[in-house]
A protein has these predicted regions:
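Hinge/lid segment of periplasmic solute-binding proteins
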Residues: 82-136, 159, 186, 192
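Sec-dependent N-terminal signal peptides
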Residues: 4-13
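Glycine-centered hinge/linker elements that transmit conformational signals in sensory
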Residues: 162-166, 200-217
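Short beta-strand->loop
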Residues: 23-27, 127-132, 140, 147, ...
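Immediate post-signal peptide segment of exported/extracytoplasmic ligand-binding proteins
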Residues: 15-21, 42-48, 122-123, 145, ...
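Extracytoplasmic "Venus flytrap"/periplasmic binding protein-like
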Residues: 40, 44-111, 146-153
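Short, well-ordered beta-strand elements
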Residues: 17-27, 48-53, 77, 126
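Solvent-exposed loop/turn segments at secondary-structure junctions
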Residues: 27-30, 57-59, 82-87, 133-136, ...
Length: 217
């Protein structure tokens, strides 16, 4: 079965231009930016030709990848969502990258260490960080000004502000998440906690309980 190399180029034949299919889950402006990056890379050299292919959402792309790997095919590059990535490694579908990487130490030192370590499993690097999702809080500045409020800088101030904005006609805070609950995880980690400790679920930690209690209130 063909092995997958997440987010790094595989050294292939140097005798002819090699097509490098890259399956990703970025549409809209992000997808157009990926296409532009690939076009620029392809124009700078003639050894590889990166071919970006949008595959739908993360879940849709993962389903297509599993089917392709079972059929003995699949892309050379794949944008793996963080929770799916270790599965590829565990099933032997990802290649270790140490032999292919010759990076300037200064380049690595300039990267955000936690993001750079996303691609490391069991002490070995199987992937490179490609994108990172960050929760963003949107608020209506005019409403804040009318109430004499400032943007909160910690969770206690956040809760006080939300209560001050709540009335019979409106809620001061609306929380939206998805089945993966990564936004809730961000609420826990921002308090200094973690949903996993010693390879076991940690949903009863002080930080996780505090996040749940705030949402309940």
């Amino acid at each position: 079965m063909r092995k997958l190399l997440p987010l790094a180029l595989l050294g292939l034949s140097a005798f002819a231009q090699v097509d490098v299919p890259f399956w990703h889950a970025m549409d809209g402006p992000a997808g157009r930016l990926i296409a532009a990056f690939a076009q620029e890379f392809n124009a700078r050299q003639d050894r590889y030709r990166v071919l970006p292919r949008y595959q739908g959402t993360y879940e849709e792309a993962e389903t297509k990848l599993v089917a392709a790997l079972r059929a003995g095919s699949g892309p050379v590059l794949f944008q793996a969502e963080l929770s799916f990535f270790p599965r590829l490694v565990a099933e032997g579908q990802a290649l270790p990258l140490e032999a292919y990487l010759d990076l300037d130490p200064g380049f690595v030192a300039d990267l955000f260490a936690p993001a750079w370590n996303y691609g490391v499993v069991g002490g070995r690097r199987f992937g490179l960080p490609f994108n990172n999702s960050t929760p963003v809080l949107f608020y209506y500045l005019d409403v804040f000004r009318a109430k004499g409020l400032e943007a909160p800088r910690d969770w206690r101030a956040f809760e006080r502000t939300a209560l001050a904005l709540t009335s019979r006609a409106a809620k001061g805070f609306i929380f939206v998440t998805d089945p993966q609950a990564w936004l809730f995880e961000a609420m826990v980690t921002s308090r200094g906690g973690s949903l996993v400790q010693d390879d076991r679920p940690n949903f009863t930690s002080r930080e996780a309980v505090a996040a749940l209690e705030m949402l309940y209130r």
